[in-house]
């Protein structure tokens, strides 16, 4: 995560947590996010350590004190480019959305800090995006190992903003997508390196790689 601007010394007056959640979602969409959800911070999804890029050593992966919620944003990838996978154009769609989401997350974190509350923007660092996106009600986990959203399917990238702003967390939604994946194997059948599982989800034990060659 990164801090971009100082926290305003005087906190802005707030409404209820539900009101602030609606407001912050509207602001995030104004900045360019396509989907927005909110979850309580759950340390199960956080990386144990991070890499200090100055010497590539392990460093503690700790958020600032007082963080209580994470705002999860989904960013749609261009369908006409994604449809060309595997190609350089599809790779460009990925890179373009990473740049886009970084700008949006930093803007939202800066906005919250101007309100007088702490906020840090995060992309792929700090914590896993997939379980947080599910926890924030943005979609369900699919056989393809991705979050399936009802609006865009898996064609999204995620960013996060950790914050101390009092918000109301969403609940995971049962959309029927996860259940559908239990009987459908179309993505696994179509995967050239056979990297996707055919059976149902399992918990615990080793997870041997399915890629051959």
Give the location of each predicted region:
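Conserved small/polar residues in nucleotide/adenosyl-binding loops
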Residues: 1
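Catalytic cores of enzyme domains
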Residues: 34-213
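Phosphate-/polyanion-interacting regions in eukaryotic proteins
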Residues: 8-41, 45-48, 105
